[in-house]
Amino acid sequence: MVAAVFGLALCAHGAQAPQHVNINQLSTTIEDVVVPLPNELFGALNKLGAVSWKEHVRSDEEPNFTERPRIALLLGTVIADGFIAVQAEDAPAVKDIGQRVLALAKGIGVGNSITPHAKAIIDAADKRNWANVRQELDRTQNSVQQAMNEVHDEKLSQLVSLGGWLRGTEVLTSVVKQHFSNDGAELLHQPDLLTYFQTRLQAMSEFNLPIVHQIQDALVEVKPLINIGNARISAESVKKVNEITTRLGNDIVKKD
């Protein structure tokens, strides 16, 4: 799930715009759930029009959290920020994010698995070797998931995935909102994935944190905006999803 949610290796610039975006062609299937691959989604956005990715780079320092579920959510958002910084070719931001990923991974007990990847990310960013940075970010996600599953922390692994999906959706809707198109909005048509996350959150009653409840409530708000059958997702719905995910993104990175 983690690799599927965060793999943001992007298509070449200047490719021909697609006649129509078919979300199923930009997806993989995880646990019988169609998971749109962000590398394909962001590549499709590039094809639909130029994107100023530097506007979406976020490198603010986060507060120190002690709750492992909170750290897992934050780790997901920071890994997603890493892919966005790569797309913007912002070497200082990528190097900073590499260090933050390592610190957060240590906070949930998987730092040893991430250390070599963090070093490789920083080295590749120094050389502006963006293909290698993407590859190491992808390996980071896989290592996080594998390490968590080995110690039966699957729920934390799911929160990492959720954090990344929320951040990716925040950026996706921000881009589409600025230059609305039906094809861009169609990239939000992910009702099965939303249901997947809702189901997983319902099974996390032991994580009794305000941010978890806020996300649960927010997903209820988002669902009718994107679960619309064969209809088109409207510009107003894109705006609302952006407002919701932006609010959650701010809540994830700040103290309660």
Specify the residue positions occupied by each region the protein language model found.
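Short, charged, amphipathic alpha-helical segments
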Residues: 95-99, 119-120, 159-162, 184-189, ...
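Long, amphipathic, charge-rich alpha-helical segments that form helical bundles/coiled-coils
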Residues: 69-80, 101-108, 112, 161, ...
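Bacterial N-terminal signal peptides
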Residues: 1-9
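Boundary at the C-terminal end of the N-terminal hydrophobic targeting segment
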Residues: 12-14
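N-terminal Sec/ER secretory leader and immediately downstream segment
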Residues: 16-121
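Secondary-structure edge/capping motif, primarily at the C-terminal ends of alpha-helices
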Residues: 82-89, 108, 112, 147-151, ...
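Extended amphipathic alpha-helical interaction segments
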Residues: 124-206
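A cross-kingdom marker for long, charged
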Residues: 206-256
